[in-house]
Structures are given as C-alpha cells and as structure tokens.
From Swiss-Prot:
It is found in: Nucleus. Transmembrane segments: none annotated. Belongs to the ETS family. The gene is ETS2. Pfam families: Ets, Ets1_N_flank, SAM_PNT. Signal peptide: none annotated. One of its GO terms (cellular component) is nucleoplasm. It comes from Gallus gallus (Chicken). This is Protein C-ets-2. Residues 373-453 bind DNA. GO terms for biological process: branching involved in blood vessel morphogenesis; cell differentiation; coronary artery morphogenesis; ectodermal cell fate commitment; mesoderm development; positive regulation of transcription by RNA polymerase II; primitive streak formation; regulation of transcription by RNA polymerase II. GO terms for molecular function: DNA-binding transcription factor activity, RNA polymerase II-specific; DNA-binding transcription repressor activity, RNA polymerase II-specific; protein domain specific binding; RNA polymerase II cis-regulatory region sequence-specific DNA binding; RNA polymerase II-specific DNA-binding transcription factor binding. Probable transcription factor.
Length: 479
C-alpha cells in the first residue's frame, strides 16, 4: 500500500476536534497490530505531527455530557412540529363541541359557550389562575376584543395559547363556510352573490381587476348569523342582461369580506344595486382613506332611518368615525323589517337582565346587520344603562341626550373598539358625520347635547317615554 493511499485513507472521514474524543477511527485500524508492522513508525509520526498541527478551538473543553442534550435547539422544523402538536391538541375540542352543541364559529358563541371553551382549555392544558368571570361575554364581543386586550384579561403565559386556539377556530370555520359556498354556487350571477346575511365580495381577485382597498383581511371574519329569522335570499331572476358580462371571480378565490347590507325579504330590482354596480355592469370600486392611526373599520353599517322630518323611507348607512371620506351619499332602498328590536329580543327569549342595558349594542348590531358595533349603537347602550347615567343620560325631552362627561364617553368607546388614543375630538367627528344623514343632530344653544332625529321608535319598538320610565329619567330642568 502506497504512502499516498494511506494518507487518503486517513482523510476519509475528517472529524472536528469537538468530537475527536468521542469517535473512533475506522475499525480496520483499531484491529490492526502496528507494533510489528513495517508502517509502525509512520503511524506514530503521523499522529504526532497531526497533534502538533492541531489548533485549539475552545470546543475541546466541552464535556461529553453537554453533547448529550435531550432537547435540541429550536429550528424552523422543530417549531413546525410544535405548532402541529398544538393544532392536534386543539382538535380535541371538536368532540367537546359535538357533546355540548357549541357552534364551530366563535362569533356565534353565547356566554355559556365561551365559559365551556375556557373550562375545556383549563383542563386540557392544566392552566392555573384563569378567571372565567373576566370573560363573561358573547363570542362576538370576545372576538372583537383584539389580541392585546385579550392578553390583558388572560393570565400570564396563557393568553397566547388561548388566542391562538381562538384564531384557529375562526380560520377553520371561515374556510369551511367558503368551501360550502363554492360547492353550492359557481358565482356566475348576482342571485348567487347575495348571501343570507350579507353581500360578499372578494378582496384578492374581483372582476375586471378591481381591488377594494381599506378592508383589513385579518378582521374579515364571518359575522354572527343573528338575522337568520328575518333575512332571506332573493330568488328572483338574474338582474343583469346577457350583454353585461358579470362573471364573478373564480372558485379558488373566495376570501369574503362582509359589505353588511341586510337583505330583509326584498324584491331586488336593478335600482337596488346602484351602490354596487355602475352603468356598465361592473362592480364599483370602494375607496377609503387612512389618516394617522385611524383605519377603515370593516364597512358602513345601516340604521333604519324613517325620518319624520323628511320623506325618506329607506335605510340610512351609518359609518364608523374612521370612514368619513367614504362615499355614503346614496342609500340602498329596502322595505322596512317585519319586526322591531323589542320583538326581536322577545323572540330570542333574551329578557332584559337587572343592571344590564335595555339595548345591548352587540345584539342591536346583529339586528341591524351592521357587523362591528357602531357609535350610534354604543351610545344607545350607554343611554339605556342606569350605571352610566353619571356621564351620559337622556334629558327627558324625547330622544335628546347629554354627554355630562364627554371624555368618559370617549374613553369607553375607545376601550370597546380597542383604540386607546380615542378622545372626545375624534368622537365628536363621528357625531358630526351623522348630521347630514339625519341620524343625530346637535341641539343648538346647549353644550354636549344631541338628539336622535331618525325614527328610533319604529326601529327599537320603544317610545322615548317608555325608555325614560324604565330608566327612571327625570326631565332636565337646566337651560
């Protein structure tokens, strides 16, 4: 065997100094008795030369035990494994949902469903210090909290797990709903485009390449099906003529965002879609603007505004305070609903609890189909809550109300919408926007005094006097 061959054999599997004490050379050299060999002197000198040429790396002092760590360092692969393990654990909640009848979509949960979910998670993950009383809210309110507010209510190191599970359930429910929607319709005409709850459009790919900016995809979860009893899908003929090419987006792109128009047992005509379709039969582009920390919040909601001072009998669109520059000058003509909010509450067997608002904003939002809670709904909730009369209350003169502490009202509105920077200046901007829509007017000559000028009596099913009596409101004698 030549010297060249021996050198190459010695270099077959070079090993770093870190593992040199742990690994042996090839067995052929271990069993070879070199004491009487012709190459004995060569191997000795080779090892000595190699030892002299080795440069210390700092790893030689590492103990053998340190290399036998049971838990390897996290890598992208191991993180994916851990994430999959969490998902597998979350899947155990499916059996609990079937057993207790908990809806798959967290937006549809009641307070009892939320408590049942927390009880399961507490037991499944052996969680401690979970105060369920802090989460006594509906699924819609829970989802509207936002991650930051949710983590504040949850114990340390626990909130992330619960929030991830909540997001996973919302995502799975949304994907399942979209799959069912795609299977049931090829989305080739407007009647297929009309959902039982809302009109939906795609934000990834819309007809003719029209994009719809301003809709935050992270918040485009399906809203609760609170209108299932009073809303039906139109089954009339196709609304567009054959020459108007209105083939909608392909089946693979169905990332829906609710446009929030309540379809209340209506007969659609071509004029009903003037907000959504222009003269060429194409979707109109919805535009919005963002300034500073303010962002477009879902889409405009609707308030039933049969104004006694005007001949309007349609439904007014009531925006949130962030969407002042959105084009809301037109309204979608629809017939009046078949029941009032009062009847709706009674049909749902939700009696007004002692110490609770007579008109909860979350339920009112579901009744009107507005999606996220709007400012006017929030004000009605505060005005029908006896505990809030120290900073906002009815004056006793019809639908007139006064902000005794406008900063406190703004603070509570910011807390509800998870906007810590909310102040009265921004709140009043939203109120001013309602002026032109004949929803709320400022009372002249009185500071912080406003009045609902829309027909709340038909919407709510209560007269102003009935609400005043329920809340113990006395007429305001101040000038």
């Amino acid at each position: 065997m030549s010297e060249f061959a021996i050198r190459n054999m010695d270099q077959v599997a070079p090993v770093s100094n870190m593992y040199r004490g742990m690994l042996k050379r090839q067995p052929a050299f271990d069993t070879f008795d070199s004491s009487n060999s012709l190459f004995a002197g060569y191997f000795l000198s080779l090892n000595e030369d190699q030892t002299l040429q080795e440069v210390p790396t700092g790893f030689d002092s590492t103990s053998y035990e340190s290399n036998n760590c049971e838990l390897p360092l996290l890598t992208p692969c191991s993180k994916a494994v851990m994430s999959q393990a969490l998902k597998d654990t979350f899947s155990g909640f499916t059996k609990e949902q079937c057993r207790l009848g908990i809806p798959n979509n967290p937006w549809l949960w009641t307070e009892q469903h939320v408590c049942q979910w927390l009880a399961w998670a507490t037991n499944e993950f052996s969680l401690a210090n979970v105060n369920i009383h802090q989460f006594l809210m509906s699924g819609q309110d829970l989802c509207n909290l936002g991650k930051e507010r949710f983590l504040e209510l949850a114990p340390d190191y626990v909130g992330d797990i619960l929030w991830e599970h909540l997001e996973q359930m919302i995502k799975d429910s949304q994907e399942k709903t979209q799959d069912q929607y795609v299977e049931s319709s090829h989305l080739t005409s407007v009647p297929h485009w009309v959902n039982n709850n809302s009109l939906t459009v795609n934000v990834d790919q819309t007809p003719y390449g029209i994009q719809m900016p301003g809709y935050p995809k992270a918040l485009s979860y399906p809203k609760p099906n609170l209108l299932s009893d009073i809303c039906q899908t139109s089954t009339g003929p196709n609304l567009l003529s054959p020459e108007q090419d209105f083939s909608l987006f392909p089946k693979t792109q169905v990332d829906a965002v609710s446009v929030n128009y309540c379809t209340v047992n209506q007969d659609f005509t071509r004029s009903n879609l003037n907000l959504l379709i222009d003269n060429s039969g194409k979707l109109r582009e919805h535009e919005s603007s963002e300034s500073g920390a303010e962002s477009y919040e879902s889409s405009d909601s609707m308030l039933q505004s049969w104004n006694s001072q005007s001949s309007l009998v349609d439904l007014q669109r009531v925006p949130s305070y962030e969407s002042f520059e959105d084009d809301c000058s037109q309204s979608l003509c629809m017939s009046k609903p078949t029941m009032s909010f009062k009847d709706y509450i009674q049909d749902r067997s939700d009696p007004v609890e002692q110490g609770k608002p007579v008109i909860p904003a979350a339920i009112l939002a579901g009744f009107t189909g507005s999606g996220p809670i709007q400012l006017w709904q929030f004000l009605l909730e505060l005005l029908t809550d006896k505990s809030c009369q120290s900073f906002i209350s009815w004056t006793g003169d019809g639908w007139e109300f006064k902000l005794a502490d406008p900063d406190e009202v703004a603070r509570r509105w910011g807390r509800r919408k998870n906007k810590p920077k909310m102040n009265y200046e921004k709140l009043s901007r939203g109120l001013r926007y309602y002026y032109d829509k004949n929803i709320i007017h400022k009372t002249s000559g009185k500071r912080y005094v406003y009045r609902f000028v829309c027909d709340l009596q038909n919407l709510l099913g209560y007269t102003a006097e009935e609400l005043h009596a329920m809340l113990g409101v006395q007429p305001d004698t101040e000038d």
